[in-house]
């Protein structure tokens, strides 16, 4: 079995161990250990039936699974358990557990060789977005940096008649409504988007974190929000403020769900309802998050300090109602590890009079 696994290494994203009976723990652990695939493992075992426990019919898979899992633990091989310790292979739980396991495989294998773009540098005043490239690299995640000036230089060199640029202009207009007074700014936005995407493609980038203020607005003349929104909608997560850990978190969520993810701040209390929190960001939500037709505009806070004419490109929208999963990693340099938190809750339909992309959230009762 180990030889068969090794011969198909490039085709195997995970291993499912199914025990119809007690099984052969030594054979199972040797096959997985010697193959050395380092992929996720799911262990499933079948039910016994109370009227079929004679010597010829009993399974003993309940006990066999405990032994197999104990061996996996002894060998330091991570494994995933099923919803119930044992159940029939004809149970609907099996399909659900396999679907969940497939998501685990996508996350593990996707992050193991992920390449995260870092365009520019983080805001000087936001040390919360600092992350350790070395700790990420230890988990197989490579950070690929580029100076923002290189992207802006590439954007400026794009000719107005360039076919790729014209396609991007059309794509943006189909993606969101553009106020007439900002039509002349749209070409700047499109050139920036093309330059970012071309750099990402050339460097095989899976997710990206962008210096979205304030050099871009001051030295080029637009915001980065719609570019990030459109990338995230294409399942290429884009995080603000060169938040590398945020980009990794978004990528993990996208791999798990197969859907766009977004970067939000836990930003405001919701009156005196302590089970709710207002989440927001300037204007980067992917289109599928938003309940209304998207409209492009200027940044709120930065529009006041930098001038609205320099901050066009923000996405305006309110997140549509539904459930959501939240996840965040951070690198702990002092302890030499990557930490994370994970939870779920609800996106409510509560009105909230704040500019930008808004999501009023409520914690899950579970």
How would you label these PLM feature ranges?
Residues 1-109, 113-117, 122-207, 347-365:
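Metallocofactor- and cofactor-centric catalytic cores in central/energy metabolism, strongly enriched
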């Amino acid at each position: 079995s180990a030889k068969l696994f090794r011969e198909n290494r490039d085709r195997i994203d995970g291993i499912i161990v199914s025990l119809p009976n007690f099984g052969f723990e030594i054979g199972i652990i040797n096959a997985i250990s010697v193959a050395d695939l380092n992929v996720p493992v799911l262990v499933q075992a079948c039910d016994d039936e109370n009227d079929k426990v004679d010597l010829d019919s009993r399974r003993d898979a309940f006990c066999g699974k405990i032994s197999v899992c104990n061996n996996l633990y002894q060998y330091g091989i991570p494994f995933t358990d099923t919803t119930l310790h044992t159940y029939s292979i004809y149970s609907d739980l099996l399909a659900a557990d396999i679907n969940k396991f497939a998501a685990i495989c996508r996350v593990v294998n996707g992050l193991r060789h992920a390449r995260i773009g870092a365009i520019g540098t983080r805001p000087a005043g936001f040390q919360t977005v600092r992350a350790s490239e070395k700790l990420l690299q230890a988990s197989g995640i490579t950070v690929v940096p580029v100076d923002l000036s290189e992207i802006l230089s590439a954007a400026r060199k794009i000719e107005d008649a360039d076919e790729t640029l014209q396609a991007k202009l059309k794509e943006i207009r189909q993606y969101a409504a553009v106020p007439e007074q900002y039509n002349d700014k749209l070409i700047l936005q499109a050139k920036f988007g093309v330059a970012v995407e071309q750099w990402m493609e050339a460097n095989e980038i899976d997710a990206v974190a962008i210096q979205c203020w304030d050099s871009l607005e001051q030295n080029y003349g637009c915001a980065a929000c719609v570019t990030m929104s459109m990338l995230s909608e294409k399942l290429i997560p884009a995080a603000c403020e060169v938040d590398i850990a945020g980009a990794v978190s978004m990528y993990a969520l996208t791999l798990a769900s197969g859907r766009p993810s977004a970067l939000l701040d836990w930003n405001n209390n919701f009156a005196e309802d302590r089970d709710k929190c207002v989440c927001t960001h300037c204007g980067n939500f992917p289109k599928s998050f938003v309940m209304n037709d998207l409209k492009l505009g200027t940044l709120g806070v930065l529009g006041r300090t930098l001038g609205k004419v320099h901050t066009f490109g923000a996405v305006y929208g309110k997140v549509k109602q539904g459930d959501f999963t939240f996840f965040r990693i951070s690198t702990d340099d002092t302890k030499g590890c990557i930490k994370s938190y994970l939870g779920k809750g609800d996106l409510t339909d509560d009105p909230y009079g704040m500019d930008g992309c808004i999501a009023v959230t409520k914690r899950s009762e579970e």
